[in-house]
Amino acid sequence: MFQKHLQKASDSVVGGTLYVVATPIGNLADITLRALAVLQKADIICAEDTRVTAQLLSAYGIQGKLVSVREHNERQMADKIVGYLSDGMVVAQVSDAGTPAVCDPGAKLARRVREVGFKVVPVVGASAVMAALSVAGVAGSDFYFNGFVPPKSGERRKLFAKWVRVAFPVVMFETPHRIGATLADMAELFPERRLMLAREITKTFETFLSGTVGEIQTALAADGNQSRGEMVLVLYPAQDEKHEGLSESAQNIMKILTAELPTKQAAELAAKITGEGKKALYDLALSWKNK
């Protein structure tokens, strides 16, 4: 039965087509039969890092001609790939892990190939985003994927300020060397907001940490190993809060904005972000100045 389906997938591979192939995000066993069939028949395999892809191919006994297509040379390589397709070749595109063009190189190549009239076919597979969401326990069908969080604190805070009251989960990627700073910025805006940190998904040291932003900070501080490896963050939807005065998150946003903007402008922007009254926010800022 296994060979039957593999053969069927292989028979469906046709020349003059660019196959965008999803690869495992950690566990090599997560590759699909269709992905194996495409990689076996591909005349050219475009790889983000040829060394990483060579290891994947070796694990399955596949010998393919690898060419490097990275962010810095993708535009230039696109015309060469179009030439291969014009010759009737089967071309596969892979990234180091997951799906090409999603936070990885690939979009420019796919666009160019489509522009000149050749088929671009997705070969679906493992997804860190879907894996994290599937175990987060968040109800509902809506979510927002942000990709990698900005590297600079100021840019992160502006981004996080937009998520103070969102009614849907937000999924993002973060790197080990920035996770501490990112959590610190989150804690300034919503320290009690629930968060899941998924680390090393499908790998040996796969870990899922859930709790408030503050609790996740504490967990990482207690165990340095939890700050290692590839990370996916799932920020849970904001809960409706009823306070007699301004919410804590609104006050935190106003505090950040008043440090960068004139009070009136900060109050107007904070009101748009939080939905709170502009006058109440303005009066809050004045009370700080009068202390």
From Swiss-Prot:
GO terms for molecular function: rRNA (cytosine-2'-O-)-methyltransferase activity. InterPro entries: 4pyrrol_Mease, 4pyrrol_Methylase_sf, 4pyrrole_Mease_sub1, 4pyrrole_Mease_sub2, rRNA_ssu_MeTfrase_I, RsmI_HTH, SAM_MeTrfase_RsmI_CS. Its EC number is 2.1.1.198. Keywords: Cytoplasm, Methyltransferase, rRNA processing, S-adenosyl-L-methionine, Transferase. GO terms for cellular component: cytoplasm. SUPFAM superfamilies: Tetrapyrrole methylase. It is found in: Cytoplasm. Pfam families: RsmI_C (PF23016), TP_methylase (PF00590). It catalyses: cytidine(1402) in 16S rRNA + S-adenosyl-L-methionine = 2'-O-methylcytidine(1402) in 16S rRNA + S-adenosyl-L-homocysteine + H(+). NCBIfam families: 16S rRNA (cytidine(1402)-2'-O)-methyltransferase (TIGR00096). Belongs to the methyltransferase superfamily. RsmI family. Catalyzes the 2'-O-methylation of the ribose of cytidine 1402 (C1402) in 16S rRNA. This is Ribosomal RNA small subunit methyltransferase I. It comes from Neisseria meningitidis serogroup A / serotype 4A (strain DSM 15465 / Z2491). The gene is rsmI.
